[in-house]
Each structure stands twice: as structure tokens, then as C-alpha cells.
A protein has these predicted regions:
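ATP-dependent carboxylate/acyl-activation modules
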Residues: 1-9, 14-17, 22-29, 33, ...
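Short hydrophobic transmembrane-like helices used for membrane targeting/insertion
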Residues: 262, 268-270, 281, 287
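Active-site pocket-lining segment
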Residues: 119-123
Length: 295
């Protein structure tokens, strides 16, 4: 699915959406998601869309539902956010209550729950310890209590953390286990796609693991190289900082060829990179010393 969002300042969003939707459908077969908070832009996009549009989004706010649900005449599926006038609830049960209210309101407009995909709103776990658990619990409740499809912005969970892809992949698997229907993620991420293929193979969604095997056909099964054994000897920076002369000499020698000299009975080791720099400094000093001094 290709997300289409034209919400830029000082831009006529309805006009731009009307221009862009036909142009995109002329160059790609991907389904389009009409992503806008402007009901007029949403209607223009849905009216011109060739097929069944996916719109993002409606929420539990009364104003939002009253603006979006009348557009059912164009057909389509809506992403439904589990938030309302009070914001994003802190508990899974409260998010379920919003989802239930959206389903009931949609039904009054003739919209079946099958045309709603609920986003239980994953936020950064670095800022809120329950940011992962709550949307997952809400997702499971919506699947079991309402029987509705679900979606998550998976990468939101890792914002502010190092090695985000690892966190994203783990969260993605946790969500899939709870019945996630669709995810906003990077399809070019090998870690994410490998996790998805492995899950499908293990969960009986990949007959005879054929898709997994085909995807891994070019991968090597050789184990990764072992990490070098830890050495008791400190590395060069540590030895210098700690004032360990002999260890510093040994560490410098272990790093490869070095320029060596003897001065005052002490061995001086110069790494090739430093030797190159010293060469240029020496040349510069020669030039400076050759210049006539000011009177």
C-alpha cells in the first residue's frame, strides 16, 4: 500500500489530492491509502480513486466520525484510531471502548465492521514503559471482542532507542502473535521481512514453508565468525591513559608496521598514520624556518 499525504502548509490539499490520485494510479498498481485529516481532500481522493480506497483516518471523536462516515457512498476501508476527545487512553480496556463506539456509530451509517481497521496506537517505549504492552493488549481485545482487523505503526515503538530495527522486529512478532492484520513498516528491512516470513512458516500460514525457503535460497547457512577472544592486555588507548609503558609498546607493535626510532635510550613507536602526519608537519616547519625573520 502506498500512502498518499499532501498535507503541506499553504497547499490546496483537496486540489492536490484530486491531481495526484489519478496520476499515481496511472503509474503504479499498488493500492493507495488516502492519508488526510481534511474531509474535503478525503472526499476528492475517494471520488477519483479507481477501485476500493483505503482512507486514513477516522477516530473516536464525534466530529471525525460525522465527517468521514458519510463518505461511505464511495466505498472503501477506513483506518480507525483508538482515541477520542480526551486523547489516547492509558489502558487497553479504554481503547477497546472507543473501538466499540466507532463500530456502533459506523453501523448507523451502514458501514460494516469489516470495513474498519483499528490502529491501537503504539508510542515510543523509551518515553512510556507501558507503550508496548497497552497497544498489544488493546489489539488482542479488539480481535477477540469485536472481531475487527487491526493495524500498528510498528517503528513508533523504538523511537529514541539504539538499534531500532531489533526492537521493531521483536515488537512486530509480539503484535503478529496477538492477531495483527496490517503493519506500517519498512519493507526494505531484511530483519522485519525475515521475522515476518519466519512467523508465517511457524504459524501455519506458509504451506510447507515454501515462501520462507524461497526467500532464504540465497542465504548462507555458515555460522558467523567467532568473536576474537578477549585479551587480558589493554589496548593502546587504555595503556596510554593508564600510563602502562610496556603495554603501550606491545599494543602499538600489535597494530601493524610502525616507524621506530631510538632517542635518549627510549624506543619511540609511530603508527603509519601518525608518521604520515608528522612528515607533513616536519616539512611545514622547514618552510617556516626558512622564511626571513621580521626585524
Amino acid at each position: 500500500v502506498l500512502d498518499v499525504n499532501v498535507g503541506l502548509p499553504e497547499l490546496d490539499e483537496p486540489e492536490m489530492m484530486a491531481l495526484l490520485i489519478p496520476q499515481l494510479q496511472s503509474v503504479t498498481d499498488l493500492p493507495l491509502q488516502i492519508d488526510t485529516s481534511d474531509p474535503a481532500a478525503m472526499e476528492r481522493g475517494m471520488r477519483l480513486y479507481n477501485g476500493c480506497p483505503l482512507v486514513n483516518s477516522v477516530s473516536g471523536k464525534t466530529e471525525s466520525m460525522e465527517a468521514v462516515f458519510p463518505l461511505k457512498k464511495y466505498g472503501g476501508v477506513a483506518i480507525a484510531l483508538t482515541l477520542d476527545e480526551q486523547g489516547i487512553p492509558a489502558t487497553a480496556e479504554a481503547r477497546l471502548a472507543i473501538a466499540r463506539r466507532i463500530v456502533e456509530t459506523a453501523a448507523r451509517y451502514g458501514i460494516p465492521k469489516e470495513d474498519l481497521v483499528f490502529d491501537t496506537l503504539a508510542m515510543a517505549v523509551s518515553a512510556e514503559p507501558t507503550a508496548a504492552r497497552t497497544p498489544l493488549e488493546a489489539l488482542a481485545l479488539i480481535r477477540s471482542e469485536l472481531g475487527c482487523h487491526t493495524s500498528l505503526g510498528v517503528s513508533n515503538i523504538s523511537f529514541g532507542l539504539p538499534q531500532r530495527e531489533k526492537v521493531n522486529a521483536a515488537f512486530f512478532l509480539m503484535a503478529l502473535e496477538r492477531g495483527l492484520s496490517a503493519a506500517i513498516l519498512n519493507p526494505n528491512s531484511a530483519a522485519m521481512m525475515d521475522a515476518f516470513r519466519a512467523f508465517c512458516a511457524l504459524n501455519g500460514q506458509d504451506a510447507n514453508c515454501q515462501a520462507y525457503i524461497a526467500a532464504m535460497a540465497g542465504e548462507t547457512s555458515a555460522p558467523p565468525d567467532r568473536a576474537p577472544a578477549a585479551s587480558a592486555a589493554p589496548d593502546l588507548p587504555s595503556a596510554v591513559i593508564r600510563g602502562l609503558r610496556e603495554s603501550a609498546v606491545q599494543a602499538a607493535q600489535a597494530q601493524g608496521p610502525a616507524a621506530q626510532a631510538v632517542q635518549g635510550g627510549h624506543q619511540i613507536l609511530v603508527h603509519p598514520a601518525a608518521q604520515h602526519l608528522l612528515y607533513h608537519i616536519h616539512g611545514l616547519l622547514k618552510v617556516l624556518l626558512s622564511l626571513p625573520r621580521e626585524a
